[in-house]
């Protein structure tokens, strides 16, 4: 169970302290009518000036008298809104699972089902997850067995709407437009505000509860995995194994910004000439002389969808040999190969003018696409990546009477991420190690129990790493792009070199030597 956060845990001013600051600013001329009334973001004073200016049904929203103004400000002074209590929930998550197993000496089965439900810690935040697993083992004969595994999961999640952050390259400031993160809002919003009132953000009416209802995201995640492994023991001490697996993962993120969200309203907020000229979400057509800013979203909202897909194939074949000679010599040998192929995709689409209250009917304005063309922005993208890896490996261990142990490992690996030259794309890595268990020697009995364990060990290895995933210039990376052009009739597509070819791009290698001692005292009560 998760409890709501509490303001006692934070050093945040209450509404009375905040109103004292506002009143001081107003008395010094910082909160005058002309600036606050048309401000892009305003709270108590902005709402007060809007009420004073609003005239309907034969009267003003708020009388422009000292008594009425002081009464309005006094209400805000004593409001002390607990945003954590309003935006957060005391949530209890539920997990339910059931499993079944049965079988005989020839075949055994295991299945399980589970369901999880989390109502969420904040408004418009919830998760449901469902999983299923099956594992079947068939002993076809004493030498041959087949293991089949299947698993699937589905996750449905809801979250407040959000846009990607941007960085001001001059000041280094990180900002996020139309941010409605409940935790950030509760920490940074004045407690003098009325949770049921609409204030101003981005030149448009804003209420956090209303915005969470009209600006949210739905995530649907599906994972599938199928695996089969065949084992064959042609001899008592030899085992062959072949494993194949397929994994699929897909994620769909749907961002619904309805007609009545603050984000949609901001694209058509132009109550007067001052607001119209200052609103950055309006568009001025450069092809029309002396044109005024206008809305590229006269009706509807946005429907943005991002899809991630992944398909992975794995195959591994191995052989192992384990034997003991004369009860003193232990040999373990293991070798095999592995092939991995992974395809990933990402698509993004920006649906403009979606009318959610009109049967999801799109009604787009051509100027939106004209503006995007002039700003060199995209309204849909497609990305694909392919990864291919092959590896051959072997390891061997020899032990004599448990006293002396020698181990060796070698791996020969290649990846399409690295340079096309054979020495760069393929790299052998290896490890050699040894250990001497002195406590197994006969002379060690004279040292017990004071010295109960003593092992000397050493290893030397060459390890490697393929490096960061974003480094892929084993061949020249050439991407298409749209050069910036101020007018739509002179647009063109170009190619530019992102990274020059590095045909010698290879693994990050590391040679490592380790020498150590393990010591135990007083029947291993103290170990070093």
Model-predicted segments: where are they?
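Residues embedded in well-ordered regular secondary structure
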Residues: 1-124, 162-164, 213
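A short beta-to-alpha transition loop/helix N-cap that caps and shapes the active-site region
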Residues: 4-9, 155-158, 466
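Extracellular/periplasmic, surface-exposed regions of secreted and cell-surface proteins
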Residues: 129, 135-144, 149-154, 201-257, ...
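Low-complexity intrinsically disordered tracts that form flexible linkers/tails across taxa
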Residues: 157-174
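Conserved, non-catalytic sequence blocks in retroelement Pol enzymes and Pol-derived host proteins
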Residues: 179
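The feature captures the catalytic groove of carbohydrate-active enzymes
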Residues: 195-198, 265
């Amino acid at each position: 169970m998760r409890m709501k956060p509490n303001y006692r845990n934070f050093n945040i001013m209450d509404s009375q302290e905040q109103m004292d600051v506002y009143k001081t600013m107003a008395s010094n001329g910082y909160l005058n009518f002309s600036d606050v009334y048309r401000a892009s973001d305003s709270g108590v004073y902005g709402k007060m000036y809007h009420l004073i200016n609003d005239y309907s049904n034969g009267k003003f929203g708020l009388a422009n008298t000292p008594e009425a103004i002081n009464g309005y400000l006094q209400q805000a002074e004593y409001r002390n809104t607990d945003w954590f209590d309003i935006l957060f929930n005391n949530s209890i998550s539920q997990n339910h699972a059931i499993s079944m197993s049965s079988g005989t000496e020839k075949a055994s089965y295991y299945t399980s089902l589970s369901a999880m439900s989390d109502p969420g810690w904040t408004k418009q935040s919830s998760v449901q997850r469902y999983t299923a697993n099956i594992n079947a083992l068939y002993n076809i004969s004493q030498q041959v067995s087949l293991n089949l595994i299947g698993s699937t999961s589905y996750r449905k999640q809801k979250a407040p709407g959000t846009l990607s952050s941007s960085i001001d390259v001059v000041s280094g400031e990180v900002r996020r437009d139309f941010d409605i993160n409940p935790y950030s809002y509760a920490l940074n919003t004045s407690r003098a505000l009325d949770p049921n009132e609409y204030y101003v953000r981005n030149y448009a009416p804003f209420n956090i509860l209303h915005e969470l209802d009209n600006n949210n995201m739905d995530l649907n995640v599906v994972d599938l995995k199928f695996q089969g492994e065949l084992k064959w023991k042609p001899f008592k001490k030899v085992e062959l194994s072949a494993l194949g697996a397929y994994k699929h993962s897909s994620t769909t993120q749907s961002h619904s910004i309805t007609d009545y969200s603050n984000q949609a309203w901001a694209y058509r907020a132009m109550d007067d000439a001052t607001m119209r000229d200052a609103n950055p979400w309006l568009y001025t057509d450069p092809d029309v002389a002396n044109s005024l800013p206008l809305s590229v979203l006269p009706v509807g909202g946005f429907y943005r969808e991002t899809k991630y897909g992944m398909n992975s194939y794995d195959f591994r074949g191995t052989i192992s040999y384990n034997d003991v000679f004369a009860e003193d010599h232990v040999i373990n040998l293991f070798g095999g190969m592995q092939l991995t192929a992974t395809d990933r995709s990402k698509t993004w689409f920006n649906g403009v003018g979606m009318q959610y209250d009109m049967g999801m009917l799109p009604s787009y304005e051509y100027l939106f696409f004209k503006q995007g063309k002039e700003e060199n922005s995209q309204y849909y993208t497609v990305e694909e990546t392919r990864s291919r890896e092959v590896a051959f490996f072997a390891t061997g261990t020899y032990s004599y009477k448990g006293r002396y142990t020698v181990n060796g490992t070698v791996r020969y690996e290649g990846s399409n991420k690295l340079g096309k030259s054979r020495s760069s794309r393929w790299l052998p890595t290896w490890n050699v190690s040894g250990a001497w268990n002195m406590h197994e020697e006969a002379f060690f009995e004279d040292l017990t129990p004071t010295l109960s364990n003593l092992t000397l060990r050493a290893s030397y290895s060459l390890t490697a790493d393929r490096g960061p995933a974003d480094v892929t210039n084993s061949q020249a990376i050439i991407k298409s792009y749209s050069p910036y052009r101020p007018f739509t009739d002179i647009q063109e597509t170009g190619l530019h070199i992102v990274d020059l070819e590095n045909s010698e791009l290879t693994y990050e290698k590391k040679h490592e030597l380790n020498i150590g001692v393990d010591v135990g005292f007083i029947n291993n009560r103290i170990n070093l």
